[in-house]
Amino acid sequence: MRKPTARIVFSLTLIVLAVGFLFPLWLAVRNGFVSPDGQFTLRYLTGVFRNPVYLEGLLNSLRIAAGTTLLATLFALPPAWLSNRYSFAGKTGLNALILVPMILPPFVGAIGFQQILGQYGALNALLGLNIDWLGRGQWAGVILLQSLSLFPVMYLNITAALANIDPAMDEAAQNLGASGFARFRRITLPLMMPGLFAGGTIVFIWAFTELGTPLIMNYTRVASVQVYDALKEIGGNPFPFALVFVMLAVSAGLYFLSKLLVGGRTYTLPGKTATAFQAVRLAGGRAWLVRLPFLLLIMLALLPHFGVILTSFTAPGGWYHTILPQAFTTGNYSEALGHGITVSSIRNSLGFSLLAMIFTLVFGIGIAFVTVRSNLRFRGLLDGLAMLPLAVPGLVMASGYLALSSLLSNLETVRNSPALLNLFDVKTNPTLFLVLAYGIRRLPYMVRSAAAGLQQTSAELEESAANLGASPGVSLRRITLPLITAHLIAGALLTFSFSMLEVSDSLMLAQREEFYPITKTIYELFQLIGTGKYIASALGVWAMLFLAVTLVGSSLLLGKKLGALFRT
């Protein structure tokens, strides 16, 4: 990329990120430090730690995040290690099935989870017991459900870390008489710690700020739900913004610590060329012993999915303290698609997600070109800024957009213009801010996808085209873009599908029924007495199938590089 072009792209993307990301983030933080007379104050921040309700919420969120990260690691580590060490028939299929839990947002899975593990659920009916498997206050259920949904992120990071370890280290220890466990504890585990920490950071941040799952599980004593409830109040309460700052500080601190520990680290012996680990080929009974942990984990992880699917086919009141539903119906699906708010929510989500996908394509490609194809001095700054949304929870971004909307809609020029009010007032029309939220938060996926494609495409092809007289635009259109199309499609699919099922931004920004996205509609339907959870489950199955198709498509296009999109 020519330097003048790179500078223009750099400047434009920097402006967009500053206005659409950094400024709302600053507003979300600022509102927690400004007194009614406009003076700087720490009263609200210290008040968060003095208020026993807020303090309990923070501690519960940290407990859930730590528990989720630990449990997700315990789920992911054994199959990842076995996959690295052994080769057996069906390994490719099992590795694909490991990713299946990602096709269902945890808060949707909570509906099915309660039907199976609730006090009057299927498991108690099978065992003839009356145990609250989800734990007092549902916190144990939140941890288990989020772990089953997020362990694939840990699995992708651990397998990548194991694949990068030079096997010569393990062989040298074996030749010196070290046992298998000793080699794992003293060589493999320390060398894979950066990968563990990278995956654990994403899981921790995700679980720490998750909003939908605690809401569905009716576990309200967590910071995310406290922020959500407080921001719905009229009167401009500053304490939730101070709480948002604390959550942002924890998330960003972990993210940068991860970058510090993981960034640029390799796993090879100095002075030697790393060779691929030769997996041991297994067959017969030994192969089944290795398959068993995969199968048990997949069965456990799919429990929420089965619960949602069965609930979607259950007649209202037809599954109560029984092993299986006693009355089935397909009417939930027709009612879900025919309900007053579901059709518009599907249309809204399709529109919002499509616009977000276009946004990430345009700016993701531009950022990738600047970072990979230019020699600008500050290109690393742009790359780091583009990846920073990974460290910022959706709840925090939504708070920032609410603050930005309030600021803009109170301007006299905006108040006097119906068109501008419709554009900038989230209470009137949240389209602009939902598209921004979806696009900014998924931008890292597109940047990494495009950058991976460019890194695999020789810059000499573009230089040859330039030497033959082709303009940069012609070279981009006829050479570069066709070569990285698969990566762009994969990134676009992930952006589109995860935007369709975004929870925190949708719940907080969509305040009028006519603009509800799918996830907000599922939550609202779940609140209905009687048929609510059955219709919500039917809509959740539709969303699950949609995300499954896009994840499979992205996996086929990216192959093993899919895991790179879920690493810090």
What is the predicted function of each stretch?
Residues M1-L27, T92-I98, M247-L257, Q278-G307, ...:
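N-terminal signal-anchor/first transmembrane alpha helix
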Residues R2-T5, L45-V53, G137, F208, ...:
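Interhelical loop and adjacent transmembrane-helix boundary motif
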Residues K3-F10, G90-K91, P152, T159-Q174, ...:
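C-terminal transmembrane helix and the adjacent membrane-cytosol boundary/short C-terminal tail
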Residues R7, L82-F113, D170, F184-R185, ...:
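Cytoplasmic-entry segments and transmembrane alpha-helices of multi-pass inner-membrane transporters
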Residues L12-I15, L70, V100, L144-D166, ...:
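Transmembrane alpha-helices
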Residues L42-T46, L55, G90-G93, A110-S147, ...:
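Membrane-interfacial helix termini and adjacent extracytoplasmic/periplasmic loops
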Residues P52-S83, M247-L261, H339-R373:
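Transmembrane alpha-helix signature in integral membrane proteins
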Residues G177, P304-V308, H321-Q326, T330-T568:
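C-terminal structured domain segments across diverse proteins
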